């Protein structure tokens, strides 16, 4: 069985051809600059992906494709497991777009294009929020007017769930321990960033909330913020709700504080003596450390902390600084292991560390492909 996985963003489209059973990738790639002259829209992007596959000798009709798997960020209360795409699903996903304005609309465009170009295959939507569907009520409930929250379905949904679930499973496999026996903290640190507490393979808390804006400081998003700031900007600075939303989503985080959302560029600015970049980094690390400590308290006993995604996997100083001085909590990392590079799961804690610290590469495309297996 082979699955085509499509992860459609506003300006890029990632694709992969995967054999779920073996984990083999026949091909993968990314089409960037959607909206430019060369790639004017998502239709052109997916056609370009097909052209790349054909150039590599992989023709769709010869691949034994059984399904097309799509990443969808927000499933709300309606979608909490992989679901066959139909017109009703698309309509409901579109209704949820205000809760994930950077993610759901381009994902819907990708799905619509793929259904048009591959009409004879089942299309499966895999939702970022699904892993957190059963969060305990104390973790998922906001302390606001209960009737208002129930009427408008306001709760913590959580995001990056496909990655958090996959990494927690891979950590257990790497350690050769039963998933059910482990209490884990997973830190998905990319341009978007989130933390989760996972007990026995089940999520018990996570940092993102109703939308992907809450929680950790991110590349362009603020993370946790006093709601009073929003009202203050609206009343005093004359900003509209749309202006504030755009600022919090696109011009905040380390970009808003330090002038760069890419950590390589941020490190260059810090090394050049840029004080704003240094503050952005310090705020990022401070927030990350707070969540690590909070989730250790939530879990009671922490067995494993795993770093994943672009920053988590590839920026050793972030891992070092996030865990520095936490020996009293049983966390000690080995500098040499932390600095080593590898594309495989690896240990970075010392033999004396009571908490095992890992770097576990995420693989959302493989996880999405495997999620399709039980549906088709």
From Swiss-Prot:
Site annotation Transition state stabilizer: residues: 160, 221
Pathway it works in: Metabolic intermediate biosynthesis; acetyl-CoA biosynthesis; acetyl-CoA from acetate: step 1/2
Residues that hold substrate according to the record: 71
Coiled coil: none
GO molecular function ontology, one term from the record: magnesium ion binding
PROSITE patterns, sorted: ACETATE_KINASE_1, ACETATE_KINASE_2
Catalysed conversion reaction: acetate + ATP = acetyl phosphate + ADP
Catalytic center residues: 128
Residue positions binding ATP: 14, 188-192, 262-264, 310-314
Binding positions (Mg(2+)): 7, 364
An annotated GO cellular component: cytoplasm
Signal sequence region: none
Cofactor(s) it depends on: Mg(2+); Mn(2+)
Domain of life of the native organism: Bacteria
Cofactor comment text: Mg(2+). Can also accept Mn(2+).
EC number(s) given by UniProt: 2.7.2.1
Disulfides per UniProt: none
Keywords of the record: ATP-binding, Cytoplasm, Kinase, Magnesium, Metal-binding, Nucleotide-binding, Transferase
HAMAP family tied to this protein: Acetate_kinase
Entries under NCBIfam families matching the protein: ackA (TIGR00016)
Entry function: Catalyzes the formation of acetyl phosphate from acetate and ATP. Can also catalyze the reverse reaction.
Family the entry assigns: Belongs to the acetokinase family.
Quaternary structure annotation from Swiss-Prot or TrEMBL: Homodimer.
Protein name: Acetate kinase
UniProt source species: Mycolicibacterium smegmatis (strain ATCC 700084 / mc(2)155)
